[in-house]
Swiss-Prot record:
Keyword set, alphabetical order: Cell membrane, Membrane, Repeat, Sugar transport, Transmembrane, Transmembrane helix, Transport
Gene Ontology cellular component terms for the protein in this record: membrane; plasma membrane
Family listed: Belongs to the SWEET sugar transporter family.
Name assigned to this protein: Bidirectional sugar transporter SWEET2b
MF (Gene Ontology): identical protein binding; sugar transmembrane transporter activity
Topological relation to the membrane, as annotated: Multi-pass membrane protein
Localization (cell): Cell membrane
Gene name as annotated: SWEET2B
Positions on the Cytoplasmic side per record topology: 28-45, 94-103, 159-167, 212-230
Subunit and partners: Forms homooligomers and/or heterooligomers.
C-alpha cells in the first residue's frame, strides 16, 4: 500500500497536470479566430515558440535518467509540447506572408537546436548528480522567464485600469498550477521545481488581485488579444 507521502506527491503533481492543461487549452479561442479568418492577423507566434522550448527542457528534466521520480513533470510538459507544436504549425500554415512563415520556421529550428544542445550536453558532459543540477538550473531559468512574462500585461492593466488583456481563467489556472507544483516540489524537496513555481504562485496571486480590483471598473468590450500572453 502506498504511503501517505507518496499519495500526497502524486495528488499534487496530478493537480498540477490538470491545471496546466487549462493553460495549454487557453489559446484555442485565438486559433478558432485564426481558422475562421484563415489568417494570423496581428497575433504573435513567438509566445508559442518560447513555450515549446520551456516544455521540452522541463520534459527532459522529468525523465528518469535526469531526475528520477519526477514523471509527472515529464507528462505535463510532454502534453504541453504537443499543444505548442500544434499551435505553431497552425500559425505557420495561416501566416499572412512568406516572410512571417519563414521567420517562425527559422525560430522553430533554433528551438529544436537549443533543446538538442541542452539534452546532449547533459548526457555527454555530466554524470549524476551534476546532470540533474545542470538541467534543473536551465529548466528553472526557463520557467522563471515564462512566469515573469505577464508582468508587462500587469503593467498594461494598471495603466489602463482595464482587465481586457488579462483573462481571469488564465490567471486562475496559472495560480492553481503553480500552487500545485510548488507543493509537489516541496514534497520532493526539489528546489528546481518549488522555487520557480513559488514565484509563479506569487505572480498568479498578484494577477488575481489586480483582476479583483480593476474588474469592478472595467466596462470594455470583448478582447481580440491572444490568450497566450507574453
Amino acid at each position: 500500500m502506498d504511503s501517505l507521502y507518496d499519495i500526497s506527491c502524486f495528488a499534487a503533481g496530478l493537480a498540477g497536470n490538470i491545471f496546466a492543461l487549462a493553460l495549454f487549452l487557453s489559446p484555442v479561442t485565438t486559433f478558432k479566430r485564426i481558422l475562421k479568418a484563415k489568417s494570423t492577423e496581428r497575433f504573435d507566434g513567438l509566445p508559442y515558440l518560447f513555450s515549446l522550448l520551456n516544455c521540452l527542457i522541463c520534459l527532459w528534466y522529468g525523465l528518469p535518467w535526469v531526475a528520477d521520480g519526477r514523471l509527472l513533470v515529464a507528462t505535463v510538459n510532454g502534453i504541453g509540447a504537443v499543444f505548442q507544436l500544434a499551435y505553431i504549425c497552425l500559425f505557420i500554415f495561416y501566416a499572412d506572408s512568406r516572410k512571417t512563415r519563414m521567420k517562425i520556421i527559422g525560430l522553430l529550428v533554433l528551438v529544436v537546436c537549443g533543446f538538442a544542445l541542452v539534452s546532449h550536453a547533459s548526457v555527454f558532459f555530466f554524470d549524476q548528480p551534476l546532470r540533474q543540477q545542470f538541467v534543473g538550473a536551465v529548466s528553472m531559468a526557463s520557467l522563471i522567464s515564462m512566469f515573469a512574462s505577464p508582468l508587462a500585461v500587469m503593467g498594461v492593466v494598471i495603466r489602463s485600469e482595464s482587465v481586457e488583456f488579462m483573462p481571469f481563467y488564465l490567471s486562475l489556472s496559472t495560480f492553481l498550477m503553480s500552487a500545485s507544483f510548488a507543493l509537489y516540489g516541496l514534497l520532493l524537496r526539489d528546489f528546481f521545481i518549488y522555487f520557480p513555481n513559488g514565484l509563479g504562485l506569487i505572480l498568479g496571486a498578484m494577477q488575481l488581485a489586480l483582476y479583483a480590483y480593476y474588474s469592478r471598473k472595467w466596462r470594455g468590450q470583448d478582447s481580440s488579444a491572444p490568450l497566450l500572453l507574453a
